Each structure stands twice: as structure tokens, then as C-alpha cells.
Amino acid sequence: MPTVNQLIRKPRQAQVKRNKVPALQENPQKRGVCTRVYTTTPRKPNSALRKVAKIRLTNGFEVIGYIPGEGHNLQEHSVVMIRGGRVKDLPGVRYHIIRGVLDTQGVKNRKQRRSKYGAKRPK
């Protein structure tokens, strides 16, 4: 623990808070156009084919977004909305595509957690 004199000579430095979603530029969501839709494999110890898309945002950033849920209709030139939120086992994926908004359809036959997947209430 420093003495009062040491603190006068060299004050405490505030910790720098790093922005985890810089491409959003302090906005809750951003719109973009898919430039490439593909699958990728997660880090160890997991194994799967995760669906992701490279997205060119309206502010010029190019980011990778995760496509949640089972099945999707995205292809090149699809207009999508992204939100923050990383995928822990996919390096470089720091954004999620929002289902049920713009060109992205909601998940079919989804009964629970429907709002997260843009699914309408079943009749």
C-alpha cells in the first residue's frame, strides 16, 4: 500500500475500460449487408458447424456476426440488423444477428424463448 507522499508524487491511474463492441459506435444495434455467409468450427473442446456471416455495416466497419437458432434464410446481399454479444467458442465473433428483423426470418416451430428468435406466437 503506497504512502500519502507516494500518492502525491504519482497519483493512482484510472483503469482503462476497453469497448467490447467498437463497430456499434455506442448504438444498441446497427444495420449491415451480408458479404459472405458460411459455417465455421468452434474452439476446443467443442465441435459443430456454427453459422456465421461477414457483414459490411452502414458505418463502413466489416464484422463477423453469429446467426442464432436452427436454420436460416440469409445469403449474400441480405440486409441484417446486428447487436452486441460475443460467441465464446468462436474467435473473432463479437456480434449477433437479430432474427425476425429486416431480411432475417424468425426460427420456424419455436415454442420457447420466441422473442430471442423472432418467432410469432403459435395459434
Curated annotation (Swiss-Prot):
GO terms for cellular component: small ribosomal subunit. InterPro entries: NA-bd_OB-fold (IPR012340), Ribosomal_uS12 (IPR006032), Ribosomal_uS12_bac (IPR005679). GO terms for molecular function: rRNA binding; structural constituent of ribosome; tRNA binding. GO terms for biological process: translation. The modification 3-methylthioaspartic acid is found at D89. PROSITE patterns: RIBOSOMAL_S12 (PS00055). Keywords: Methylation, Ribonucleoprotein, Ribosomal protein, RNA-binding, rRNA-binding, tRNA-binding. Pfam families: Ribosom_S12_S23. Part of the 30S ribosomal subunit. Contacts proteins S8 and S17. May interact with IF1 in the 30S initiation complex. Belongs to the universal ribosomal protein uS12 family. With S4 and S5 plays an important role in translational accuracy. This is Small ribosomal subunit protein uS12. It comes from Sinorhizobium fredii (strain NBRC 101917 / NGR234). The lineage of its organism: Bacteria, Pseudomonadati, Pseudomonadota, Alphaproteobacteria, Hyphomicrobiales.
